[in-house]
Amino acid sequence: LPNIKDIQLPYHLYSQEDIQNRLVYVEVSRGCPYRCEYCLSSLDKSVRTFDLDLFINEMQKLIDRGARVFKFIDRTFNLSIPICTQILEFFLNHIELDLFLHFEMVPDRLPSEIRDLIKKFPHGSIQFEVGIQTWNPEVAKNVSRRNDLTKVKENFYFLANETGVHTHADLIVGLPGENIQSFAHGFDELYRLGPDEIQVGILKRLKGTPITRHDQNFQMVYSEDPPFQILKTKDVSFEEMQKMNRFAKYWDLIANSGQFKQTMKLIEELSQSTESKSLFWTIFRLSE
């Protein structure tokens, strides 16, 4: 691989039409230090960072040209706290321009330096995409995923109650060792933390990822057609997986869209009247 600091930054290639009508995708780093087995980034052996001064200079040029919506595609934006804080400080100094910023964040890494900064941003000007993937520690261990759930809870509480950050959390259905009951528990636990969106994704077999090492022990069966989605596992039957596909569809339509807030209130009230008081199982049965 070439030295990342020798790569010419490409942001001058954005046209004025791009800047006026599209998201501006940017990156300050490439690679990921984590080894989550379902993710293509697990194949990258290192994290490389662009020259920060040059990067910030390019961001200034984009702002001067009228860019207002920035989506960072760094796999782990808050990996380096000094870099993360410098970039946040830069955009905070221009926040009066009505900027919107999107970052992918590690859920259990939110030290005071970052907390103090994001509290200063206006409501809705930042979105954090936070990968949880599973709430079950054993399942997380199966796929080499690390989450400090105590810190995750603390950080979500902070984001929901002390900042205006919009939070988008991810869960994956079909991970090796996770049944529907375990997923339901994790979904309900996550929902109680108050993220603005929960994306329920279905596991996909990405070429070259080590998730395939579990195929035999957990009887993982994937579709032979793109996007190579999981069809069943030892713990989730084909019928259950189809129900989870419907669950994900209706959850996205009703909850994540934000278009059915009154309906969501009614569903929440209905869930509280059940013995389990589970929002997951209430929507699961409604989507059958």
Model-flagged regions — what are they?
Residues 1-2:
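Glycine-rich beta-alpha loop elements in corrinoid/cobalamin-binding modules
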Residues 8-161:
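Radical SAM [4Fe-4S] cluster-binding motif and immediate context
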Residues 32, 234, 241-243, 284, ...:
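Intrinsically disordered, low-complexity segments used for protein-protein interactions
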Residues 35-38, 64-69, 220-228, 259-263, ...:
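Short acidic (Asp/Glu) and glycine-rich catalytic loops that position anionic groups and cofactors
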Residues 81, 93-109, 113-277:
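A structural motif corresponding to the C-terminal lobe/cap of the Radical SAM core domain
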Residues 274-288:
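Terminal or standalone catalytic/regulatory effector modules within metabolic enzymes
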